[in-house]
């Protein structure tokens, strides 16, 4: 009888509520949260944060670093895991006729001795119909072309 009473005291896992976003509008997702795009068959879920190499507060860094995160995108039976490398300026990928852009990740990286819990991460996302029209962020493997004088 005591075991049955204790079973009711187990902590419950909190599942974030789904959100609704619109095309060409910024919406916010937490890890585990799903957004449906109004009047479209597209759903986006913020699945995971793999790494966070952003420059810590108060540090002098040569590069800004990035957050590597996973979104799951779905239109009907077309489902795809998409890995984003979010640097200053964001990262964008095309899926099923849409451009999905992660523009920012919060919270900012704190001092080196502090850790950000996975449930604290927030992604700012924009969805557009069609292909990306703005420049794609430069990846570390993309050669940079210097102007010649």
List each language-model region with its residue ranges.
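Bacterial signal peptide processing site
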Residues: 10-12
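N-terminal secretory signal peptides
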Residues: 15-63
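Extracytoplasmic
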Residues: 30-32, 39-41, 64-68, 79, ...
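Mature extracytoplasmic domains of secretory-pathway proteins
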Residues: 50-87, 91
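C-terminal partner/receptor-binding element of secreted or periplasmic proteins
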Residues: 105-149
């Amino acid at each position: 009888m005591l075991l049955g009473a204790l079973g009711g005291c187990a902590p419950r896992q909190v599942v974030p509520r789904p959100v609704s976003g619109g095309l060409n509008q910024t919406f916010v997702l937490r890890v585990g949260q799903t957004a449906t795009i109004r009047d479209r068959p597209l759903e986006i879920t913020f699945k995971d944060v793999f790494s966070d190499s952003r420059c810590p507060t108060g540090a002098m860094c040569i590069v800004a670093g990035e957050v590597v995160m996973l979104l799951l995108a779905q239109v009907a039976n077309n489902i795809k895991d998409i890995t984003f490398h979010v640097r200053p300026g964001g990262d964008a990928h095309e899926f099923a006729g849409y451009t999905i852009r992660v523009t920012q990740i919060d919270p900012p990286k704190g001092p080196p001795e502090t850790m950000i819990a996975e449930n604290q991460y927030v992604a700012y996302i924009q969805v557009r119909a069609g292909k990306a029209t703005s420049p794609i962020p430069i990846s570390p493997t993309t050669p940079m072309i210097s102007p010649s004088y």
